[in-house]
A protein has these predicted regions:
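Conserved SAM/SAH-binding beta-strand->alpha-helix loop
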Residues: 49-51
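Conserved SAM-binding loop of SAM-dependent methyltransferases across substrates and taxa
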Residues: 30-40
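A short glycine-rich, Lys/Arg-flanked "PGG" loop and its adjoining helix->strand segment in the class I
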Residues: 99-112
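A short SAM/SAH-binding and catalytic strip from SAM-dependent methyltransferases
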Residues: 85-98
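Conserved SAM-binding loop
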Residues: 56-57
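Conserved alpha-helix/loop element of class I SAM-dependent methyltransferases that forms part
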Residues: 2-21, 32
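Conserved Class I S-adenosyl-L-methionine
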Residues: 30, 135, 141-201
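Conserved class I S-adenosyl-L-methionine
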Residues: 113-140
Length: 201
């Protein structure tokens, strides 16, 4: 499986200047998108999943970013560190109360960057997350973002087994929805996503 992570990171770096910024990075577990941190002042990567945090620590070490990237197993709502920007990495829709998460982010930083699947995303539909995505963007759009952009990413798979290994554990309706790929090989699923910059004051 390949997500075009390098392209997403390029879009992220063009969308928001992380250089010399102190960052709280929400949903950082796994460390897939940490390349932007090479130019940041310091980053606290937050994820509640201990296994994801272990993967994040490994990614940080392999990228040589230990001097500026600290991995923290925690819920965002318990974080109190003041920074320049809070960055939600494809996770706002997974938070039970996205509006509350955004309110808490505003107590930590004057700016918030949200990257999340776009409403209408086929990938979100296969994952059974379309309602979550709509809810999270409704919370973001409650106050018009200072800056917004939309991109089309992709998820690439060699076969159905690879797809099922990635999202089959979500159960229904995902298993029924991805059944159309059972006999297909080397296919892609579009993953449109949005970026938004929220500011306080």
């Amino acid at each position: 499986m390949a997500t075009d992570i390098a392209a997403i990171v390029r879009h992220l770096e063009a969308f928001y200047p992380f250089r010399d910024k102190a960052v709280v990075h929400v949903g950082a577990g796994g460390g897939q998108f940490i390349a932007y941190a090479a130019h940041a002042k310091r980053v606290v990567g937050v994820d509640p999943d201990p296994e994801a945090v272990d993967r994040l620590k490994t990614a940080v070490r392999e990228a040589g970013l230990q001097d500026r990237f600290h991995a923290l197993q925690a819920d965002l709502m318990t974080v109190t560190e003041k920074v320049d920007v809070v960055f939600f990495e494809f996770c706002l829709h997974e938070i039970a109360d996205p509006a509350a998460a955004l309110r808490h982010a505003r107590t930590l930083a004057p700016q918030t960057v949200v990257v999340d699947p776009a409403p209408g995303s086929k990938w979100a539909w296969y994952c059974g997350e379309e309602e979550k995505v709509v809810r999270s963007w409704a919370a973001v759009d409650r106050d018009p973002p200072a800056l917004a952009a939309r991109f089309i990413g992709k998820q690439s798979f060699h076969d159905y087994g690879e797809l099922a290994a990635k999202i089959g554990m979500l159960g229904e309706p995902t298993l029924t929805r991805i059944a159309e790929f059972r006999d297909r090989t080397d296919f892609e699923i579009a993953m449109p996503y949005r970026m938004a910059l929220l500011t306080t004051g």
